[in-house]
Amino acid sequence: KKFINNQNFKISDFSNHSHLDYKNIDAQSTGFKNNSFDFIISSNMIHHLPYPLKFFEEMHRILKNKGKLIIFDAHCSVLLQSILILMRHEGFDFTKNVWNSKEPATDINDLWSGNSAIPYLIFNDEKKFNYYLGSKFKIKYKKLCECTLFLNSGGVTSKTFYIPMNFFF
């Protein structure tokens, strides 16, 4: 919020942090009125969604006509997969069907768990994306970014062994 100076800019999350305008919001069922937003930005959260299709349906419902949904999330490259294995953080499962609204793609009992394969499964096959969502959304721009951006985004915790450097200094 300190970088975007606009009174209409609001921040939400599935948490109760004091800096949030909307707290404990389930992105698959927000409770917002229809046609409420011109823009929605989804930052590194798609991979946490048990039912991605429900998310897109909800975003379509709450976006105004000609509204824009901007999504950025990790690309589950071989490098990211290796790092996730080493860190024992979240995980990836390419066998999940992200288009099934009955079978979860992540652990529904732990919304902080993640399946880092979800963005790949949604956006890599544009024919499938268009089949399921083409009447509501179009992919206008897609770019792969270095996975360390995701790892340094602030939401990653590691269970990897490390030696605190301040111990030596």
Name these PLM-found stretches.
Residues 50-54, 79:
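Short N-terminal helix/helix-N-cap motif within the alpha/beta-hydrolase-1
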Residues 44-48:
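Short catalytic micro-motifs in class I SAM-dependent methyltransferases
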Residues 41:
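A conserved beta-strand element that flanks and buttresses the S-adenosyl-L-methionine
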Residues 53-68:
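A short glycine-rich, Lys/Arg-flanked "PGG" loop and its adjoining helix->strand segment in the class I
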Residues 108-127:
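Acceptor-substrate binding/catalytic loop of class I
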Residues 69-106:
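Conserved class I S-adenosyl-L-methionine
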Residues 1-30, 54:
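Class I SAM-dependent methyltransferase SAM/SAH-binding core
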Residues 127-136, 140-169:
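A C-terminal cap/extension of S-adenosyl-L-methionine-dependent methyltransferases
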